[in-house]
Amino acid sequence: MEYEKMLYMPAASEMPHSPQLKPHQFQAHTPTDQYSSYADNFDLSLLPQESASIPTTVFQYNAPQIKVECAWDSQPIQQQQQPTAPYTNPSSHQLIPPPAYPHSAYPSPQSSPLQSEFAAYGLGRFGGSYDSLNSPSPSLEAVSIKQELHILPPSPPESNCETPSPRSSCGESIKAEPLDADIESLIDLNSLLQQQSLQSPQNLQDTKPDHQLLRECLEDTSFQKRHNLKPLALESFIGGLAEVRGDFEPVISLALEHAKREADAICAELQISQDPNGWSPAQVHAWLRSTLAQFRLPPVADLELHFCENGAALALLSEEEFVRRLPESGSTLHAQLEIWKMAYADQPAHQQHSQQSASTDHWPASYAMPHLDLDYNEDSEDDDDMEADAQVAPLNGSTTSPPATNASNGGTATVKRPNGGRTGGGGSHIHLWQFLKELLASPQVNGTAIRWIDRSKGIFKIEDSVRVAKLWGRRKNRPAMNYDKLSRSIRQYYKKGIMKKTERSQRLVYQFCHPYSQ
């Protein structure tokens, strides 16, 4: 450019209003021409003609001069590119700055061959290895791309159309993870733990019937063996809770019917009453031997020495006393006796009176109520119509008084004396205080309803007043019986000297007077 300016610069004499400069002045102020050596050797034929375009444009360069189409297998190109290889490939991860001249002013050169063609050429000729010297356009980008194909893991087939990069390779390595996740999902610890937790209750349920069957065999009776029934608490047979009896009402009814049939057959064979309280000592011994033979228990030779009581006293013995006298068969005998008592208590009152009229009733001396002249019957006790004056005679029964006549029904009502006298009215009936002591004599059955607090002093407590009232109403065949009526009868005993209030007044706690506490 400086040279062209010098060619077109006019002479000093031609410039208007320019002072004449001397040669020594020009040399002093003008620097030495740096292009003088180039001007001497410059070939003017290289300058463009007048019809040509401006020399500063780059349109003079044609695309075929840059892109060498037939230089792929030429050895001279390899020789020319060998010295430049160290310069062009110092590092595969560095970028060369753009050229100094404005690159945007020039048209972009033609694109290099496609990556697929370039890869096919490299793999076909060099067996998969890349040679930077044989590249048609040895640029940094091409060298970097080909090196990444060998350094990084291969891309999946669907990504061959894109330029591989470290980021894309990492992305495809992540895509392969779902396959491992699918394989690992075959072993799910949560599902295994859940299955184990579900199987454990089933195992318990599977083993439970075995233990339950063992209990049934240990606590079984003849009726349960025949009908394969589960053992029930004896409380449910004689009242118990209302909901328990409601659920097992059919089973209870069937069991009582079976017990009644067995009792009828044994009573007909032994000529005894169904009420254990009416048995004599000889009848007690006959029933014990029959029960031992029925359940195939060891026979007892001296049975009369072990049990010398009559039926009423036998009914008051506890299970511990039975076991103490007969360790091998005492528990079974006591359980069978309780079943007989329940079967008899479930019968209507008129059947009980008819059965008792055919047998004698023997109460022990401690239960023998002294002679009382009463002008009331048992039903009037429940209705709070007790207006009579009770006169208690000596315990030996030496003095007696004629029985009083009940004006309401025209019959006589007398209480049994210690000498075993019969009661009037065609049959005997149990009194409330006797019934309470009968319940107290069976704590295994009635312990949740009534219990002793101090047996020596005759103090007891009614734990379940509703249940005691129901049992008393069943015994007297009075379905409308409740505890209010029963408590009125108990208060009447205060006037007769049969019961009294305790020293420390407590609710539902009562005390028998002497000799009724014995």
UniProtKB/Swiss-Prot annotation:
PROSITE patterns: ETS_DOMAIN_1, ETS_DOMAIN_2, ETS_DOMAIN_3, PNT. Residues 84-94, 158-171, 396-412 have a biased composition (Polar residues). May have a role in germline development. GO terms for molecular function: DNA-binding transcription factor activity, RNA polymerase II-specific; sequence-specific DNA binding. Residues 258-344 form the PNT domain. This is DNA-binding protein D-ETS-4. The keyword Nucleus applies.
